[in-house]
Swiss-Prot record:
Pfam family, one: NKAP
Coiled coil stretches, renumbered: none
Species assigned in the record: Homo sapiens (Human)
GO MF: chromatin binding
InterPro entries: NKAP (IPR040466), NKAP_C (IPR009269)
Biased composition regions of type Acidic residues, renumbered to the chain: 206-217
Annotated GO CC locations: nucleus
Quaternary structure annotation from Swiss-Prot or TrEMBL: Interacts with RBPJ, CIR1 and HDAC3.
Gene that this sequence comes from: NKAPL
Keyword match Transcription regulation: yes
Name used for this protein in its record: NKAP-like protein
Keywords: Differentiation, Nucleus, Phosphoprotein, Spermatogenesis, Transcription, Transcription regulation
Biased composition regions of type Basic and acidic residues, renumbered to the chain: 105-129, 246-255
Similarity-based family: Belongs to the NKAP family.
Protein task: Transcriptional repressor of Notch-mediated signaling. Required for spermatogenesis.
Length: 402
């Protein structure tokens, strides 16, 4: 399809118009103009379909509702086809923007609807939280139901009377406080009024009698000094009374504490006698002050070696793990009858026990040997001293006889 030149097309239109004007001799009517323009546009559109705008005549009329003639469905008059093509592109852009605006408006309306629904639901929930929903669940009881086991009508009456008495006491206390506050306020007002009167009289007297005021000032100072002395004496007396009260209270507390302590000391031995001992009884300790504590070996708990050595000294069996509550005689009788009192299931524990017992036995043997040696030495020394005394005694007698 050959290209169309826009300049030649516009020149043909202008020439045809001039011919019509010259032939008629009068200005053409708007209807003739429109018909001529319509015919030109139709012929142009028939010949050149590729350059026709993408909308119909009705769409253009709807876009431009008010034309120059006042009718709504007429096309605008383009004097140049280039302007018509540019107008078509702008109209397509307008349609696109119009479509986007409609979508945005619809989304905004949906959001407003959702927001209003949410606010409505929120208000409804707040109302339900405050007032409740009796259609869903019943109203809560105004007064709690009392259980028959826990509360009885007598107890309820006592509680009511107690509450009434407490309320009456509180009301009476409040009434007393109000009375005292009123009396204090009245006294303050009287004092203020008397001070004001005294000031007025003093001002009037000062103008008339200055000498008498000086004397009265001296008298006032003396009175004030006397009052201060009295107050000081009263304070000192109060302090002394407080000190004496404190001392008397302290002494009474001490006496009561001493009485209580004596009572507790008297009661403690009785309690100790009545208490039953748990476990095997420890043998009586046979130790002298001269003997020093022996070392029973290593790997022993503090006091364990001495406790085990006491059993060995008394000639009793050392109690083992699992034998609490039995005496050594009972343990020995059970072992003689065939019971295994301390098995060898835990080999390491059994080895530790045997090592400790051997340490105690060896230490006890050493102690026994040491004591035996000491006893033998003492016997020898005593024998030597006795023989020496006899010899001295004999010699003294012989001298006396001579």
């Amino acid at each position: 399809m050959p290209p169309v030149s826009r300049s030649s097309y516009s020149e043909d239109i202008v020439g045809s118009r001039r011919r019509r004007r010259s032939s008629s001799g009068s200005p053409p009517s708007p209807q003739s103009r429109c018909s001529s323009w319509d015919g030109c546009s139709r012929s142009h559109s028939r010949g050149r379909e590729g350059l026709r705008p993408p909308w119909s005549e009705l769409d253009v009329g709807a876009l431009y509702p008010f034309s120059r003639s006042g009718s709504r469905g007429r096309l605008p008059r383009f004097r140049n086809y280039a302007f018509a093509s540019s107008w078509s592109t702008s109209y397509s852009g307008y349609r696109y923007h119009r479509h986007c605006y409609a979508e945005e408006r619809q989304s905004a309306e949906d959001y407003e609807k959702e927001e209003s629904h949410r606010q409505r639901r929120l208000k409804e929930r707040e109302r339900i939280g405050e007032l409740g929903a009796p259609e869903v669940w019943g109203p809560s009881p105004k007064f709690p139901q009392l259980d028959s086991d826990e509360h009885t009508p007598v107890e309820d009456e006592e509680e009511v009377t107690h509450q009434k008495s407490s309320s009456s006491d509180s009301n009476s206390e409040e009434h007393r406080k109000k009375k005292t506050s009123r009396s204090r306020n009245k006294k303050k007002r009287k004092n203020k009024s008397s001070k004001r009167k005294h000031r007025k009289y003093s001002d009037s007297d000062s103008n008339s009698e200055s000498d008498t005021n000086s004397d009265s000032d001296d008298d006032k100072k003396r009175v004030k000094a006397k009052k201060k002395k009295k107050k000081k004496k009263h304070k000192t007396k109060k302090k002394k009374n407080k000190k004496t009260k404190k001392e008397s209270s302290d002494s009474s507390c001490k006496d009561s504490e001493e009485d209580l302590s004596e009572a507790t000391w008297m009661e403690q031995p009785n309690v100790a006698d009545t208490m039953d001992l748990i476990g095997p009884e420890a043998p009586i300790i046979h130790t002298s002050q001269d003997e020093k504590p022996l070392k029973y070996g290593h790997a022993l708990l503090p006091g364990e070696g001495a406790a085990m050595a006491e059993y060995v000294k008394a000639g009793k069996r050392i109690p083992r793990r699992g034998e609490i509550g039995l005496t050594s005689e009972e343990i020995g009788s059970f072992e003689c009858s065939g019971y295994v009192m301390s098995g060898s299931r835990h080999r390491r524990m059994e080895a530790v026990r045997l090592r400790k017992e051997n340490q105690i036995y060896s230490a006890d043997e050493k102690r026994a040997l040491a004591s035996f040696n000491q006893e033998e030495r003492r016997k020898r020394e005593s024998k030597i001293l006795a023989s020496f005394r006899e010899m001295v005694h004999k010699k003294t007698k012989e001298k006396d006889d001579k």
